[in-house]
Amino acid sequence: MANIKSAKKRAVQSEKRRQHNASQRSMMRTYIKKVYAAVAAGEKSAAQAAFLEMQKVVDRMASKGLIHANKAANHKSKLSAQIKKLA
């Protein structure tokens, strides 16, 4: 553990930030899983609705720097392609 006051403060802030980021990342993954589940079930309308929600969340996480912009684009591209395949 740190001895210097500023180092202790940074350690506390870092841990708080780590927990917040983990929560946000988990939430984002949950939205992505909802789209995959709807696609697997073959429900196009449900998949499209879940995709719109997921898209907002993924874009927000990319803009905040939690994930890279290319990773967000990759998620959206793969899932939209799978939704388009549904008849």
From Swiss-Prot:
The cross-references to InterPro entries, in alphabetical order and at most eight, read:
Ribosomal_bS20 (IPR002583), Ribosomal_bS20_sf (IPR036510)
Show the segment(s) annotated as Disordered: 1-27
Question: Any keyword Hydrolase?
Answer: no
Q: Can you supply a Gene Ontology BP term from the record?
A: translation
Give residue spans, biased composition: Basic residues.
1-11
Q: Name one GO cellular component term.
A: small ribosomal subunit
Q: Which UniProt keywords apply?
A: Ribonucleoprotein, Ribosomal protein, RNA-binding, rRNA-binding
User: What Gene3D superfamilies does the record tag this protein with?
Assistant: Ribosomal protein S20 (1.20.58.110)
Pfam families hit by this protein: Ribosomal_S20p
One GO molecular-function annotation for this sequence? structural constituent of ribosome
What is this protein's function?
Answer: Binds directly to 16S ribosomal RNA.
Please name the PANTHER family in this protein's record: 30S RIBOSOMAL PROTEIN S20 (PTHR33398), SMALL RIBOSOMAL SUBUNIT PROTEIN BS20C (PTHR33398:SF1)
Q: Which HAMAP family match?
A: Ribosomal_bS20
Family membership: Belongs to the bacterial ribosomal protein bS20 family.
**Identification of the protein by name:** Small ribosomal subunit protein bS20
Per the UniProt record, the source organism is Actinobacillus succinogenes (strain ATCC 55618 / DSM 22257 / CCUG 43843 / 130Z)
